[in-house]
Each structure stands twice: as C-alpha cells, then as structure tokens.
Amino acid sequence: MKVKELVNKIADFGTSPHVYIQKEGIIGGGKPDDVVNTFGEMTVNSFIAAGRGQIKIFVK
C-alpha cells in the first residue's frame, strides 16, 4: 500500500484529519494533501524501511 492510499483511507474517517509523518528526524505534517504530495508515491513498507519512519495520523 502506498502512503497516499493509507492517508486517504484514514482521511475518510474524520472531517479534519491531520497527518504527521516523521522520518529520520525530519517531521513533515499538515493537511493530508501536503503529506501525499511529499511522500505519497512511496509504499508504507519502503517508507518505514528507509529509516526509522513513523506515520502518525490524528483524526479530529
């Protein structure tokens, strides 16, 4: 599954989802569109394998 697919699935659950992706000390977060534009084409497995990546998703 690609990161964008995961984000889109989670985004369906909330009216204002907020997604944070943390990777190797670099934190990118914000609206799902921002995250998808940056990391969306990576698969979740490759994202995590490339470094200690974490995907934190908060749904309001």
Residue ranges and their predicted role:
Residues 15-60:
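Detector for the mature cores of small, proteolytically processed
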Residues 1-20:
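N-terminal acidic leader/helix
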